[in-house]
Amino acid sequence: MVSLFGILNIGSRGISASQASLDTTANNIANANTEGYSRQRTVQQTLDPLVTANGVFGQGVNVVTVERIRNRLLEAQVREALGDTNFNQQMGTILAQLESIFSDPLHSVSSTTETLYAGGLNDLISSFFRAFQDLSTTPDSPELRVAAIESAQALAESIVSKSQQLITLRMELNQQIGTQVQTINQALQEIAGLNGAIRSVEAGGNRNANELRDRRDLLLRQISELVPVQVEEGSEGMVRVSIAGQWIVDHTSANPLVVETSRNEDGIDLVGIRIGGQGLHLIDNEVRKGKLGAILEARDRLLPALSEELDVLARGVIFEVNRLHSASSGLVGYSAIRSSLDVPSRALDSNSTMTLNRVFNEPAPGSRSATGNRPYPIQDGEFTIRVADSGYQKQDTYSVKVHTDDTLAALVSRIDRADG
């Protein structure tokens, strides 16, 4: 049978348990708008009963601990979703920048006859070919010649401008990589410190470091917004964090990311990411989520592809214009023409065995061009030479065949023999 003193103790313990629950509820209300805060609740447990000859009597209630209401599986899914969401948002921002580059507003280009209006590349290309089409109908018109030249200049300047803007955007993305890596490293250091603090607090048994765990989970979320991470929690409450299978937090030790910068032959900075002292480099294939993943995807894949497309466009326009231009004549004839491209002097030696393919197509030392020293590869075919007198009253036409295995001296000799 419970004594009066026992009854008072049971009541006291009940009041204390209720007070603890009220305190926990008040704390929940106070932190309702606190970022990363997890709602808490008291865990109550009945005390061991008093066993007597007259029966078994309860001894009241006791608060065992205060725990967070948190689901680890859902937390991992949230981190996964944050990576996807922020990847798409960052990529959307980058695509908007690219849209502004390639969909520029209307701007004026001065002309001797009129003001031409051009928008994006499509409009400029259309204006360019329209100007040459007009010129083809009246080739001796000075006004149309000026208009054709100006449309060509506008197109060339636009392509160069867009190419430079892509380089500038790449540099901006490199800077963002450095900034985000710094943010990640700061979070990693704090997580490693929180691991040690959580272990110390919870080493006493039923104590839960709820606020410390909330802070750590918030940091893990923030990192997941930037880069995909995998999280494992051990028996002591400490977590290990990895990227692409490599640890960046191992209990109380952080293994920070390192930004490495080099410069290529074109003077463009190349920024890479390495994991701490392990010398392991991260590439975009390993980081396909988060803002950092979007930046790497855009910098290493999207921008180079767009730059290459611009180069292909420029080469195509240049090739076609030069092809048509080479078959035409100017208002004033030439008595001599000097090429802007040079060849090795030894290739002109009559005893030289250097073929045209080697002279024109093989890359020079240090060259990265797939077509060697020239913008276009030489191919088997023929070209036409037209010779006219000073008044254009008489013109002779000669065709000269070209083979890639010819020597330059042989080609010169073939040209000399063309007129018989």
Task: Enumerate the predicted regions with their spans.
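Structural signature of extracellular appendage/secretion-system components
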Residues: 1-420
